[in-house]
Amino acid sequence: MKLQTTYPSNNYPIYVERGAIDHISTYIDQFDQSFILIDEYVNQYFANKFDDILSYENVHKVIIPAGEKTKTFHQYQETLEYILSHHVTRNTAIIAVGGGATGDFAGFVAATLLRGVHFIQVPTTILAHDSSVGGKVGINSKQGKNLIGAFYRPTAVIYDLDFLKTLPFEQILSGYAEVYKHALLNGESTTQEIEQHFKDREILQSLNGMDKYIAKGIETKLDIVVADEKEQGVRKFLNLGHTFGHAVEYYHKIPHGHAVMVGIIYQFIVANALFDSKHEINHYIQYLIQLGYPLDMITDLDFETLYEYMLSDKKNDKQGVQMVLIRQFGDIVVQHVDQLTLQHACEQLKTYFK
């Protein structure tokens, strides 16, 4: 499947298929030099997939740490210095091969190297079906996640679904959170459909039917980011579950998707409190338990600490914390939420696990 962005200009293709990696070679000849930034995990299992590409004299491989460990100032500077030592021109390509963190990091390198060079995304995880599309790139700060970054469109996104075969279950769980988020944004019927399809751990682990929902998720995100690239309006909806989720992820050092799922439950509790919504919290908790999400850490949540991280969320303004909330399916809002409501929601969340 080939999708295409529909901006007024500077559009890029998104290949979503098995064997999609073959498309990389069609781009290599266009650049003076190319640097494949590949995470250590992918390099361990799939290094041979890039043998043909690396046979080009002007293609270099840079192995970087997997996951959020790579999104640091130290790694950023080290990578830039290595690339600059090759006397690069602006007709250079940075090719990100790995999960969402790899794409974030490599994209920020591409956006800032010589004030912008070509950038190709080659996502290798379910989670990255979300982050590879839309042009958000960046690294982390001690103050929080993704606070240093840019909007920078890739030249192409090449999503080879064969990479998913070796994902450990923890990565499947983490990635599914973003797939499920897109279903929630699409509405109640789509949410019910995906819950009925992936109804337990065994089915989710098999990845049976995942291709369809990944493609649907990408289409959902494309519709939103083309309408609002710089996150001034509806693109904020894509942060569903992320205000509280990012705080939980950053403080408790758990996988991104696991934290987002906690954030999704949390926003349902907040929506019930603010709008008298009728979301069945037990339903969502039981669904996550059936899928195998480890939720024991919820009893250890410390609101005061998490609130400090929430205050650093990029959606906030001078009025305080903003959250994306599902008032009811089909009615999504970005709402300021006061500290007391947030605290009560955190306390209520914890009561479900006592």
From Swiss-Prot:
Gene that this sequence comes from: aroB
Sequence similarity: Belongs to the sugar phosphate cyclases superfamily. Dehydroquinate synthase family.
Co-factor(s): NAD(+); Co(2+); Zn(2+)
UniProt-recorded name of the protein: 3-dehydroquinate synthase
NCBIfam families tied to this protein: aroB (TIGR01357)
Subcellular location: Cytoplasm
Function noted in UniProt: Catalyzes the conversion of 3-deoxy-D-arabino-heptulosonate 7-phosphate (DAHP) to dehydroquinate (DHQ).
Enzyme class: lyase
Species this chain originates from: Staphylococcus aureus (strain MSSA476)
